[in-house]
């Protein structure tokens, strides 16, 4: 199973923007949005979470890629193609 895991924090305007971008442009991919306080430990130990939003590409319970900050839908689509996600 593959999914995009958006890690957010309270009061983060960029997090809201990224959530909207994902929901409106990637209905064919499972999307999970979670506040940093509820992110599973296995993700927290594999990624240094210092900036938000952070988008994690997970496939078969393996982190394939991640980035922090906001990106356009076009850039995310390019990443999905490059990663063959």
Where are these regions (language model features)?
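Local sequence-structure signature of Cys/Sec-based thiol-disulfide redox active-site neighborhoods
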Residues: 1-27
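Hydrophobic beta-strand residues in large extracellular and virion-surface proteins
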Residues: 4-7, 22, 31, 55, ...
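Thiol-based oxidoreductase modules, predominantly thioredoxin-like and allied folds used
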Residues: 5-9, 27-42
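A structural signal for the main folded, soluble domain(s) of proteins
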Residues: 16-18, 30, 58-60
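Short amphipathic alpha-helix with an adjacent loop that forms part of the alpha/beta core around
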Residues: 41-48, 83
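Structural micro-motif
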Residues: 46-56
